[in-house]
Structures are given as structure tokens and as C-alpha cells.
Amino acid sequence: MNLTILDTNLEPLAILDTYESLIWTDRYQAYGDFEIYESVRDDGLLSMLKQDYYLENTDSDHIMIIEQTQISSDTDSGNHLKISGRSLESLLERRIVWGQKILSGSFQNGVETLLNENIISPTDANRKIENFIFKASTDPYIVALK
């Protein structure tokens, strides 16, 4: 299983194809997660596995975001790196809605309004998450929700 390391602009930086352990869990109705366990090496890998960088798996439809990097040292087994995180949709947890917001209209329009005002094109440019888009659903059940 090959992983591509992506920077915050989703530009590929490197391929990660050797590791001691990889757990990659896709979930249907919850955030997926991953954990990589690898010995520390001198090929610059550590500098590319930064918090808020992304990992793309050739065997998955989900992109994961790196949330934690830990280095552990052991006299017997040497230095090891543990990288973990969750699937990209977990980014929505990082945003709050400022003030009270009253929504009217369809469910889909409400979701679009909240995403636009807090992630896609907020008034405070520091709150914007690049490359985040809203794609309206054509599913008749979603469109019919009020």
C-alpha cells in the first residue's frame, strides 16, 4: 500500500511505501483514522510528515489529515515515529459558528450557508480552508428535506 504525502495545498511531496506498521481505517458514518509506525531515518521523511499535512492512500477513497506526530526512543529498538490522524471530514470539527445563526429554507441550503460563512468564504480570511468546496446534492431525498 503506497501513501502519498501532500502539503497543505494538496501538492504531492513524496511517496511513503515502507513502514513497520500501517493501520488505515475507512468508516461509512464516522471519521476514518490512521496510524503509521516507522523507524526514524535520515531521508527527510520526518520533515514532510507535519501536522495538518495530508496522506492519500492508493487503496482508499479518503484522504487523511496528520494530527499527531510522536517520536519514541528505546535503547533496544532505536528511535521510532508514530504518525496518526483522521479523515479529512474531521476538519469540520475545527470550526465553530460565531454568534447565533437562524437558517431558513431547505436543509441543503442551510448546510451550504454554514459552510460558506465559516469555511469556504468567511469574512475573516484566517478562517478559510483552501480547496474546500460545497457540491449540491441531486438526491431527491436530500433536496426534499426542509
Sequence positions of predicted segments:
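Assembly/oligomerization scaffold segments
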Residues: M1-G105
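Charged- and aromatic-enriched interaction segments used to assemble
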Residues: H80, R86-K146
